[in-house]
Regions:
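Central hydrophobic cores of alpha-helical transmembrane segments
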Residues: 102-111
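Mid-length scaffold segments of soluble, non-membrane domains
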Residues: 78-86
């Protein structure tokens, strides 16, 4: 099948104008997932190095500095992928005729980012936020992501 042209990539990811069918949305969304998956994997491998206790370790630990430098670059990549996903999904929402395509396209990312933030925050404030309070964020993210996957990846669009 080969790589898409730069014009096709620009159409899919750089603006929310236009329409795409479900097959194009599925392929492009899987491409975004394949692009960010290695970044997530490296982030998970470096996560233990972000725990830094000055009572037990020196002020500067090279692996901790590397882990935080990576997290900064990962945040940049994650935002670019999120913007690309919103633009791609807005095109698909427009194709199936749902109102407010940008708002609906942003909803799954909001739910996933809130769930990730809850997972990050909970261990740091465990005395005031029990572990069970993270689960509603997870449930909301799964429900919204499942609904979005169905609507954009499998629901029929307008006939061409």
């Amino acid at each position: 099948m080969g790589w898409p042209s730069s014009e096709r990539i620009r159409f899919l990811f750089r603006a929310d104008q236009g329409r795409v069918d479900r097959d194009v949305w599925r392929r492009a969304a899987l491409g975004l997932l394949a692009f960010i998956a290695p970044f997530i994997g490296v982030g998970l491998l470096l996560a233990p190095y972000t725990e830094h206790d000055l009572a037990n370790s020196p002020l500067f630990v090279p692996m901790t500095a590397l882990a935080y430098a990576y997290l900064i670059s990962f945040a940049f990549v994650a935002m670019l992928v999120a913007i690309s996903f919103v633009n791609l999904s807005a095109k698909r929402f427009r194709d199936i005729g749902l109102p407010a395509p940008l708002g609906l396209a942003s909803l799954p990312l909001l739910a996933v980012f809130l769930a990730a933030a809850a997972h990050w925050l909970q261990p740091r404030i465990a005395e005031v936020m029990p572990r069970w309070q993270v689960y509603p964020f997870d449930a909301a993210a799964v429900i919204v992501a499942g609904w979005t996957l169905y609507q954009l990846g499998f629901a029929p669009g307008r006939e061409k």
